[in-house]
Amino acid sequence: KKYLSIIFDPAFYINRNRLNLPSELLENGVIRSEINNLIINKYDLNCDIEPLSGVTAMFVANWNLLPAVAYFIGSQESRLINHSEMVISYYGGKISKQGEAAIRSGFWHLIAWKENISVGIYERINLLFNPIALEGNYTPVERNLSRLNEGMQY
């Protein structure tokens, strides 16, 4: 059920810096459905339903926490842990350049799982993040299951 919600209801989780709507609009089922269709069309999101792999199930189970997971993973790499900044960034506030770098690094670790997660989930990961935090050149990283598990358990 959560997987279907992620695929068909991106208005529920899209970062407020990507699309900031009054909550009253999302409470109306018809308007919410149209907003979801607009988001799906704007980002050309795949809506095929695929079997859940183990890694996809991990992403789905922790979906709304993936920005915090990314921050934790990136912070581990840079040896920076600042919980208050993680909370600020999660709610769409302004974060430091160092915090942005940590989020970006952690995001790269998440998308490194592209070949192991469903297309629909992969395409939607970036919608969870403040686009400013993702600016910059992509740096490929190797998949690291222990780091992913550690971030999700955190």
Language-model segments: residues:
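General marker for long, soluble alpha-helical cores
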Residues: 1-154
